[in-house]
């Protein structure tokens, strides 16, 4: 699993249509039937964009594990492709079906469902943690790390696994869609922001701005693609050449991974992610690679044997991995308890629900109030019109659970059928908690629920297959909880764009089916072409080691940690709890400057280089906002998406060249003058 950045997006006022325009749209426009909202052209565009975003997600997941939201890019590119296609056919004299915001919403839903499986499918976490390379990296003699707990990636079993686990979450909460969206009036900030964006595309003002945003995205996509191609020529053979190893801050800092590697992807991530996330990542890099690891290294020979390899868990590498795990678990545990507490409080107290739920209740005059009521009535009517039968949802969940319970033990023999069945009994409750929490805070804790399942099953199964059983259970739980929250988010988007709930559900099913095939295929491209899991290469797959170590930890405990490592882990675990608590109890003007522990944890294990890149992105955005905030709000997302997509597209020809054993012609290398 990667660290997924909260998916809320800031929408500038120019993107929001005037109130009168919204009222006319909501009360007078013709709303297509749900079948008309799902089109062949829309599904074709969804498949193309889903493939692109799966590649981007895999690249981020296998390199640093931080995945920003690509929802804005999905909506924007979906609008651009279909609008361009309809315009082209119209000029040729063909009669084309108008492109509606409902069709745009279906495309958005389908794309997000597709590339979401590249994240929740575990290709950078629990699935790849099972492979032989991760086993060898931890060490054959490491307690609890057994050779029989190895299952290497295989295209067909991965596709089969995704098909049997990815659909259950969609059926688990369908009966509660009215409760979550209409009764509790949960905001689902990302879903609301996406809906406002799509609504704006289909107004005259918004369409013009969207056209300019697409031009901007295309410009920076081209620049990023050209730059990535240029960099390839100097990257040589191995992992020590090229711009990716440019000692921009000097050779001393370069040894501690402090350098700028000219990556368009990470700069784009810095432009998309909030300033506090980027600054938290940089602070984590400074604490770990600037202070902590040099300090621990000074005690080599005392705290751990000095002659160990750089990837030996009995040495410095063990500190890096386990302290990162401690911070991640501390952050995840705090947020889990917080979300459950908020959920219970809001559900048990109607008074608290009325007062505290984040519902927009701005003061309006009588005429505006009547217009808002008309809009709400229309949305409610459309949302409730196409009913999804309760019997269908229950039958779907029970049927899929039965198939999954019979199939998963065949793929992962240590995970017995009764463990799978127990997971499916408790999954709907956890899916509800996660969906409700996402609606309130925009923060999905799917990975935290997955880690809980990992620890419990690994400890129960024990040393005889516990690692594989725990990792597989993590995947089962994560898939259900994640897709359920995504579906509710999409229902909120559909509600605000006057899209049918049935078309949202069907498009989520279609997108998930696409993802079950596209996500493994695009991962297989990386797996075949690149050295995935090499700790010294670009595709480190950092969370593979972390997840396997978590499973081993659930079985063996802390017996084999290096000296003082456990004490440091306790310290950072408690620090993560305290920092999160401070973020919640201090006033917003102070809490906005308190770092996020989860973001700080990522560079502890990976390195500081990507933190430099992301900080460059956030500095560019900060300066841009000071010079022209309006332009920054309108175009920063397009620039970032272009940088990320261009670099992602280059991955395809780069992988093909690697498969064909065509190496870059030049190795650009830097060393000290005294070495000559």
Swiss-Prot record:
Cell compartments where the protein resides: Membrane
Transmembrane segments: 38-58, 62-82, 110-130, 154-174, 276-296, 321-341, 392-412, 413-433, 452-472, 510-530, 561-581, 604-624, 639-659
Membrane topology, from the record: Multi-pass membrane protein
GO cellular component, one term: plant-type vacuole membrane
Matches recorded under InterPro entries: OPT (IPR004813), YSL-like (IPR045035)
GO molecular function, one term: oligopeptide transmembrane transporter activity
Chief location of this protein within or outside the cell: membrane
GO biological process terms on file: iron ion transmembrane transport
Domain of life where this protein originates: Eukaryota
Keywords (A to Z) from UniProt: Membrane, Transmembrane, Transmembrane helix, Transport
NCBIfam families, alphabetized: OPT_sfam (TIGR00728)
Family of the protein in this entry: Belongs to the YSL (TC 2.A.67.2) family.
Note: Was also erroneously assigned to At3g27010.
Chain's role: May be involved in the transport of nicotianamine-chelated metals.
Name of the molecule in the record: Probable metal-nicotianamine transporter YSL6
Lineage: Eukaryota, Viridiplantae, Streptophyta, Embryophyta, Tracheophyta
Gene: YSL6
